Amino acid sequence: LQQYQVRGKVTGLALAAGAREAGNTLPGLSGASVDVEMTQAGGKASLAIASGGLVLPGVFEEPVLPLDQLSAEVRWQVDGPRLAVQASNVRFSNADAQGELRASWRTSDAGQGPRFSRFPGVMDLAGTLVRADGTRVHRYLPLSLPAESRHYVRDAILSGSASDVQFRVKGDLRDLPFNDPSQGDFRIAARVRDVTYAYVPPRLQPTGALPWPALTQLAGELIFERSSMQVRGATGGFAGTPGVRLAKVEAQIPDLSHTVVAVN
């Protein structure tokens, strides 16, 4: 069809993730209700998900993202091979976090050279979380970060919660996490509390070595920026030494692809 116009409402919608180009995939979803108006040139939709989820292959190590609730207003435009999508008033919650965001996405310019294809595209996303489970931070680190980095965060953060979380992703997703600042931004900053941080997790220690004491009851600022991770201005203590309190703790991994930790 060269021209069409559709208006309708769908409930209980489930769409499987599908192949698109060169190993890239389209996302899927489940448990959705959609009120949509669309033509061949684009459209708009009100999206609600209850006890469902999104499927994001190629984005996270765990591609299925369960959602207790999600609501969003979505618009899109189609111009030949070029696609653009804007999502506003996005509010979401699940067992790991609760927050809101806004985002825009478009296909990359395939005419820029052989390393470029239309997908995974160019993203501009900003959002906030009012609550987050610190032990699940690793689950939301993108696959563009090395597995060793993501697994270090998984094994090092043993407990804790976060509030006032700010996150930003801006740039061609092919370049994530944007180690060259001219390519874009990738940043997550959060106020954390009651954190237990095993900065040398047992799996990184030699067999038979005595364990390094974890930092406990940490409260401060946790920042992921490009390929780095930092703990700033934290207070806390060491496991097994309840009478010792620490102030102004600073911990840094300058490059998560090489897990070298500095703690002051």
What are these regions (language model features)?
Residues L1-Q86, A97-A234, F238, G243-N264:
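Membrane-proximal interfacial segments on either side of biological membranes
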